[in-house]
């Protein structure tokens, strides 16, 4: 993986963490982004080194998800199984799906397959294979919905 791809992968992981924090604590977006810029991205915390991330890409994902939350949640909800709601999803999975869906909707410069693959990898960092498969299927379906040619 080249340096640009690595920095984008790190940005995606950091964005999911930031979105999770926002969901848990309702941290204002400016404060949230500042905290990640100053204390998380590229830092070493408890002997874990956080990779350098593509900071503008991180900012775009976090701000974009929060600005377009209703549109993103509607796209996800449309692909959930009957009887499922956003509230039923684990908060980490919700952050993964929201970030991935934002990229599918707003970042036409990133291929669908790359978005799906990247967020499946993020899901694997937090969950076992079943949840990663869930993220894969849902993001792939959303990609087909929003990137119709």
Curated annotation (Swiss-Prot):
Keyword flag Cell cycle: no
Keywords noted in UniProt: RNA-binding, Transcription, Transcription antitermination, Transcription regulation
GO CC list: cytosol
InterPro entries: NusB-like_sf (IPR035926), NusB_fam (IPR011605), NusB_RsmB_TIM44 (IPR006027)
Keyword Ribosomal protein listed: no
Record family assignment: Belongs to the NusB family.
Name of the featured protein: Transcription antitermination protein NusB
Organism: Sphingopyxis alaskensis (strain DSM 13593 / LMG 18877 / RB2256)
GN (gene name): nusB
């Amino acid at each position: 993986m080249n340096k640009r791809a690595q920095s984008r992968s790190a940005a995606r992981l950091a964005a999911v963490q930031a979105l999770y924090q926002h969901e848990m604590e309702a941290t204002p977006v400016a404060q949230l982004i500042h905290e990640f810029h100053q204390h998380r991205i590229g830092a070493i915390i408890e002997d874990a080194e956080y990779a350098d991330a593509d900071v503008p890409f991180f900012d775009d994902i976090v701000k974009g998800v929060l600005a377009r939350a209703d549109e993103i949640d509607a796209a996800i909800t449309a692909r959930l199984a009957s009887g499922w709601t956003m509230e039923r999803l684990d908060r980490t999975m919700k952050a993964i799906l929201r970030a991935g869906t934002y990229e599918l909707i707003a970042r036409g410069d990133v291929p669908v397959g790359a978005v799906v693959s990247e967020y499946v990898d993020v899901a694997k960092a937090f969950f076992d294979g079943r949840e990663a498969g869930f993220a894969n299927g849902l993001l792939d379906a959303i990609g087909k919905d929003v990137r119709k040619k």
